Curated annotation (Swiss-Prot):
The gene is rpsM. Disulfide bonds: none annotated. PANTHER family: 30S RIBOSOMAL PROTEIN S13/40S RIBOSOMAL PROTEIN S18, SMALL RIBOSOMAL SUBUNIT PROTEIN US13M. This is Small ribosomal subunit protein uS13. Pfam families: Ribosomal_S13. One of its GO terms (biological process) is translation. Residues 98-128 are annotated as: Disordered. Belongs to the universal ribosomal protein uS13 family. Part of the 30S ribosomal subunit. Forms a loose heterodimer with protein S19. Forms two bridges to the 50S subunit in the 70S ribosome. Keywords: Ribonucleoprotein, Ribosomal protein, RNA-binding, rRNA-binding, tRNA-binding. GO terms for molecular function: rRNA binding; structural constituent of ribosome; tRNA binding.
Length: 128
């Protein structure tokens, strides 16, 4: 199993798909990385040579922000928006959609489940 950027890539998958399992690398970026290293996208991870794995590791770890560093960067960006008190920061703080979506209806993923009002479970009645 090849280990790149702290992620174990599954041996039986194509390298093109396996690279997308690294946080911060999508389909397009994976294709560009493989093009730069000269590796065929249809190659399975188990068929990669040590030299090819090292070339991938060099490009990803030295030239890209991935995994924990990227997660930290995103979290810090959101924290900065909240700290400066801008509109987007307020939306993040209130747990509402940030990019202008409607909230009168929908937005349930961001707002969470509806509060349950006036719903009681039926229990045993006294005196029965």
């Amino acid at each position: 199993m090849a280990r790149i950027a702290g992620v174990d890539l599954p041996r039986d998958k194509r390298i093109e798909y396996a690279l997308t399992l690294i946080y911060g690398i999508g389909w397009t970026t994976a294709r560009k990385i493989l093009e730069r290293t000269g590796i065929d996208p249809w190659t399975k991870v188990r068929d990669l040579t040590d030299d090819e794995v090292q070339r991938l590791r060099d490009i990803i770890e030295k030239e890209m922000v991935v995994e924990g560093d990227l997660r930290r960067q995103v979290a810090m960006n959101i924290k900065r928006l909240i700290d400066i008190g801008c509109y987007r920061g307020l939306r993040h703080r209130m747990g509402l959609p940030v990019r202008g979506q409607r909230t009168r209806t929908n937005a349930r993923t961001r707002k969470g489940p509806r509060p349950r009002i006036g719903v009681k479970k039926k229990g045993k009645q006294a005196g029965s």
